[in-house]
Design a protein with these regions (language model features):
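Active-site core segments that coordinate phosphate-bearing ligands/cofactors
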Residues: 1-235
Length: 235
């Protein structure tokens, strides 16, 4: 989770990272800083499920996984996933945090496993967002980038959990494009902020489903409690 800011505003508790942006800090109306909440196992958690649990090797495995997850009901029939496979940074700063599936029963199948991972990663990202929000950041919408932005199901889960519209960034090879923008602006070919906005390409906005707000609020509370309980039982 990254949030642009005109002011340098580090978190006194050290739960987020504060960086200079590529824009010059201190200029009025210009986001010269950004704050970042780091979730260590986001796409990595889905890859772990693909490789180590499902064992799927087909090129379209991720598409097949999210299509399968769409068959499961929101909330994954009570199944929760903690995505702390390599510890966690924001908000816990806990290298000893560990992942878990909790609530498994005979009624759960592959669809619930995949959806629980998507939901668990989203809960972890929301925890990072909540820290940014507590420090004064309150964006009206979420811009989703990366591989997860290609999944309509994951877009909807993010919108529902965050309670905000989601705009997926469809610009391909985002890192390479960023390097081009920085290089071009660095040699004076164009204005960085103006060109970055002009070159960005977005998909359709996904609105949150208000009927799921209560469900996901309950699941988020259970997710947070599971971390607290799991923390008292180190591996």
């Amino acid at each position: 989770m990254a949030l642009p800011s005109e002011q340098m505003a580090p978190d006194p508790q050290g739960r987020i990272h504060t960086f200079c942006s590529a824009l010059e800090p201190g200029q009025p109306g210009q986001a010269g800083w950004y704050q970042m909440g780091a979730t260590l196992s986001a796409g990595m958690a889905l890859r772990w499920l693909r490789d180590s649990v499902l064992g799927w090797t087909q090129p379209d495995a991720y598409d097949a996984m999210t299509a399968l997850a769409a068959q499961a009901a929101p909330g994954s029939q009570g199944l929760l996933f903690l995505p702390y496979l390599v510890g966690e940074r924001t908000p816990h700063m806990d290298p000893a945090a560990r992942g878990a599936f909790w609530g498994l029963t005979l009624r759960h199948g592959q669809a619930e496993l995949v959806r629980a991972v998507l939901e668990g990663v989203t809960f972890a990202c929301y925890d990072a967002f909540a820290v940014l929000e507590s420090l004064g950041g309150a964006p009206a919408e979420i811009i989703l980038a990366g591989g997860g932005a290609r999944s309509l199901l994951w877009q909807q889960i993010v919108a529902d959990v965050f309670g905000r519209p989601v705009r997926p960034l469809q610009t391909s090879e985002q890192s390479a494009l960023g390097a081009i923008l920085l290089a071009g602006a660095g040699v004076g070919l164009f204005d960085l902020a103006t060109t970055a906005q002009a070159w960005a390409s977005y998909g359709e906005v996904v609105a949150p489903d208000a009927s799921r707000r209560g469900l996901y609020a309950e699941r988020l509370a259970a997710f947070r409690e599971l971390y607290r309980r799991n923390k008292s039982h180190p591996s």
